[in-house]
Amino acid sequence: MSQKSNFFQKRYSPTATRRYYGKIETNFIQPNLADIQIKSYQKFLDHDLEKLIASYFPIKSPNDRYTINFRGLHRTEPERDEAQSRAQSKTYEVGIYADLELVDNDKGTVKKARKSKKNIASNTNGVFLASMPLITHDGVFIINGIEKFVISQITRSPGIYMLTKSQLKLSNSRKRVQEGYVCEVLPANGSVMLIYISNKKKIEDAFVQILLRDAVREGAKIFPITTLLKAFGLNNREILKIFKNNEFIKRSLEAEIYNAKDFLSNVDPEIKNLLKEFRDGKTDLRRKGIASDQKLRSLVNEYVTLEKQYNALKQTSPNDSSLTALELEMENKMDSVITERAAKHIVNELSISLRDIENTEECHEVSFHALLCARFFRNKRYNLSNAGRYKVSRKLRLTERIYQKTLACDLFLKDGKLLLKKGTLLLKEEIDKIKQAAKNNEISFVNKMQLTTDGKAVDLAKESLFYETIDVYITNDNLSVSVPVIGIHNENDLNKAMTLSDFIASISYVINLPYGIGKYDDIDHLGNKRVKLINELITAKLESGFTRMERFLKEKLTIADGVNRGQQINEEGQVIEQGEKKELTIKSLINSKPIQIVIKDFFNTHQLTQFLDHQNPLSELSNKRRISAMGPGGISREDPNLDIRDVHYSQYGRICPIETPEGMNIGLIMSLASFAKIDENGFLMAPYRKIKAGVITDEVEYLTALREDEHIIAEISSLVNISNDNKILDKEIIGRYRSMQGLYDPLKIDYIDVAPHQVVSIGSSLIPFLENDDSARALMGTNMQRQAYPLIKPYAPAVGTGQEHKIASDSGLTMSSPCSGVVSYVDNSKIIITSDSSKKETVNLVKFERSNQNTCYNHKPIVEIGQRVNKDEIIVDGPAVNKSELALGQNVLVAFTTWNGYNYEDAIVISERLVKEDILTSLTINEYVAQCLSTKNGDEQITRDIPNVSDANKRYLDENGIIMVGAEVKEGDVLVGKVSPKGQVEVSPEEKLFKAIFPESVQNVRDSSLKVSHGGDGIVSAVKRFSIANGDELNDGVIEMIKVYVVQKRKIQIGDKLAGRHGNKGVISKVVPIEDMPHLEDGTPVDILLNPLGVPSRMNIGQIFETHLGYAAHKLAVRSLISSCFDQNKAKEFAIEINQPQARVERLIKGLKNQINDRNIKSEKEALEKLDNSDISLVLKEIGMSFDDLIYKIATPIFQGVNFLDLQDVMQEAGLDPQKNQGKFKLIDGRSGMPFERPISLGIMYMMKLNHMVDDKIHARAVGPYSKITQQPLGGKSQNGGQRFGEMEVWALEAYGAAYNLQELLTIKSDDVQGRNRAYAAIVKGAAFPEPGIPESFKLLTKELQGLALSVSFIYDDNTQQDSNNVSILQSDGEQDEFFNDFEFDTEGY
């Protein structure tokens, strides 16, 4: 790593070279920007899917007669490739087959699935489960021919959190909030638990409680924490021993009823009745209660038996030594009774289903204790996941809490040596000693406790409970009061389920918080959030499908098993009689429909599955790197919590602080930072270089947010002085520790950033001079780049950041060379490369395809025959790509000045040159689909013989009735002629006879042709025809499908939206002829006039820097061209600098030399003075170039690029004296020929045409559909609706007294049905307009008033009244207006 001043030529590809002004040069290799989801889905297909299926097997029948085993997974080859899937509107997918075997344990036979018609061709064994979509090399899914993408979700990570306030979500959007010292246990699968000490009581009276949500989510129940510990199998003595008689724990024991010493005296009615029953000699254990109760009855009976033995022995031998043993045995038995009774109490309070334990295979016995343990200590019911276990282990380890505390006991190693003595202040060095000793398993602070419960359930079946404990003093000043700090043992690290050790360590953390031991968690910290990639999202969805399949399978096995010995099932799963028994097979048992439905729902209706944003390469790549906090289990967009949406310091280098939507989704939809990665647990990581003893090494480490919090990290900037051997020379440099920034000694710094722009996303990193823009404008600029419409002649920005090539390369819209070799053939549709091994590789190009956003997807080769190419080198430009660099717009000459008020309020004035020369012209491709269906009345037909359509309207249809490619179509033209059979009608005998004689002349069909929609004028670019007769797969009921693609060439026009990269946007208000535009003194007309008032208040000064630097880059190219005419040695270097082929540049120099010779110019200085833009323009046109090609490309990376001094140097080099003109130039008004009063800021700015074009928005309606209820016109362009004339518009007309206009608008132009029909008739007949009638909306109002029990009637001028119910608006009663004699009206339609 080294620092550079000024610039050097940086070559990104053979066609892309830029002047690089970055101050920091690094050899860090940027990761591929699009491969995160590709690798994730590949992992799912290769590992996760098989692991998921294997977790459900083996499945056994209730009586163990049958067992189904899973032996592996197989995939077929895809039936069609990516191109075919897109063309045929099919899914790019493979078949998934499971290798299952059915074992009959009675007969000892093993059966496997035989090949079916579906898998016989693929030579795949097994049961077909589902068709699984494949991810393409671009990282997208093709679902029904449409490219889709699954964005990642960021959620709170499972784990244990210490908070001052938390909540449990209940049903019906209710919440249960708890405040105090709260430990929130958040599992990946299972219910949230809150272990807390309430702040509603004095700390001297408070005790530890637990809040649990019931099984039906209707409410939440509170228990003393010791009640739960006892239900898990601990007794009073063990609890007090673990927590060393802590006062909070003592008060918890006092608050509950399950204490051995007073349990019998305060016994609950159930135990009291059982004791009475067994003491009276009634020993029928099964007489009462369900199976789960039998354990409790058995324990009470055993206790009574011991009690009787004790009493009998005490009477006969009061001094017998065995009495003590009996007392201990009775005490242990009472502990077991308490455990079972406490467990029953919790189970009943939480409404936990007893079927879970009575039907489970996970427990060795049926008891409430076993049920409770199975619920909290089993993976399937309570799962922390790998990420959750990592978080829990990290949170509950001792060393996290004892920093800067004083040791209250001696710490010994296992060999008896003293590690740390009592009274030691635990700082980083001492804690590192403890960590190292624990890592080597040398320390002896691990406690082992024997459990007294006789239950044999789940984790508690182990004989011992392991936990770690260290005593520390509460304060370092008062060394008299100590508390135990309890942590979990390392053995738990691989266990995804909760353990009793976890509970105990969590309780210890809570009771230590009031003493200031431990720290609260920040739930907005990225260390407490994780990203769910597609493999996790689809696995979670598939679990529900496999669970349903497992349930169906078990039901069928129950029928097939000895449970119903005389019955078996057929392949549909139905019971068959004894006489028609069939052999049981795998296929008759497996029902895979739930899995197929789940996969289909996931890729079609899941909240995080979206249409891929194909607007341009940047929008596609940004879409793939987007993460959402919404989705299943996520945050609602209506949630007003600003803390969730705000920028957090832990997002540095992981999530972009700039790129996010502006609306209600702000802060909920985010983008990954440029270099961010995701680890195996889903935590975001940022790259940093390791610093050792003040020297920056080449070692790059990716750190999670939690690991980063442990280190001091420096920011890399041009202000840091670094020697040639990468040693930091400054005594102090800026660094950060967590959220604090300060000056640090380089020897104390652990890491340094790899690059300044690692903090922002790829979209934000494209904005030059980002550091000079206001954050709100930077956000707008980032978002608007994604809306840029691909142009037919795109140009890469003159002032870039150096990221343009990387984004174009990783976007997937360009094409790279598959090998190293020489180009042997190039045309419009393919490129052939002869590799170094003489093998020919063909690269097929995409031509004028339609994208999801109706943009034109077209490839253009950028190599020539005989050119040498390297592997993975870009050889084909895609849409919005120019010479392997991202090109979202055009470099245009702009001036900041007003112009007759036409650029008021951000409006933009443009030159007609942009229209005539197609500078900002784009292509839009619309798809029209016609389907020929099979109906109950007969099949539809594609034909040219369309009833009631003139030959003029069918002139472009071929003999089959399909539009010809290249035809220019207008609105309403027929694209595909199609007729549909009418419904069955009664036919007279004469018509039957006529039909029999002339069957073809009388057709009972109607016109259902596909026509060009409103505003869809264009040229037909392609027609695709699919038919069942040709073997194409179509949807049910579809005989034939025809797709017609119509291309629109959209020139820039008034109403279109333009924007720069700095959040500067506006709508075109005027297109001015070139001769009327302001121009420079040499005659160069300005392309765009921007309002200067749009700069200072928006605080995006970056656009001014870009303007000056861009103009200097253009002038530099002109000066270099002239210089090359006098020094031939500079020609090659000049060709590289302007990214043009050497041969073309030589022709350009030759042409300009002729101009110089003709004008007898002798020196370079004279040429610079006498040659103007018009002279150079003539030469450029002769060789097919324009001024847009004659410009230097500059890279100014954000936070380290061109500064004010560099800009002055560049302008000076270009002959623009910054001290003299300050970037302002004399402009002359093209209309008057007079110069403007003052010099005007002028330069070259990169402007983009956005996807907000007037052609898509402007709309007019003459006739159209009406609402059924109000009879008012519908709204919106899509429904051919009208323009709403609202309340404020009515006020405006009222203010001017325009009564008649207002009356027309509110009656005959809206919902006066009879009046508008009369008006139409009057217009046709040329008669006078009739009086308006009563609007339909008024009638609707009367009905609503009547619904409020109010009588409404009409009172006329002659004081006659009429009930509103008797007034027919649609037609007057009893009379027909004379206007309607010759007309028929459809009052419901047009």
From Swiss-Prot:
GO biological process: DNA-templated transcription
GO CC term (a single one): DNA-directed RNA polymerase complex
Substrates-to-products reaction catalysed: RNA(n) + a ribonucleoside 5'-triphosphate = RNA(n+1) + diphosphate
Classification via PROSITE patterns: RNA_POL_BETA
Catalytic activity, EC: 2.7.7.6
Superkingdom assignment: Bacteria
Family matches, as HAMAP family: RNApol_bact_RpoB
Protein name: DNA-directed RNA polymerase subunit beta
Organism: Mycoplasma genitalium (strain ATCC 33530 / DSM 19775 / NCTC 10195 / G37) (Mycoplasmoides genitalium)
Gene that this sequence comes from: rpoB
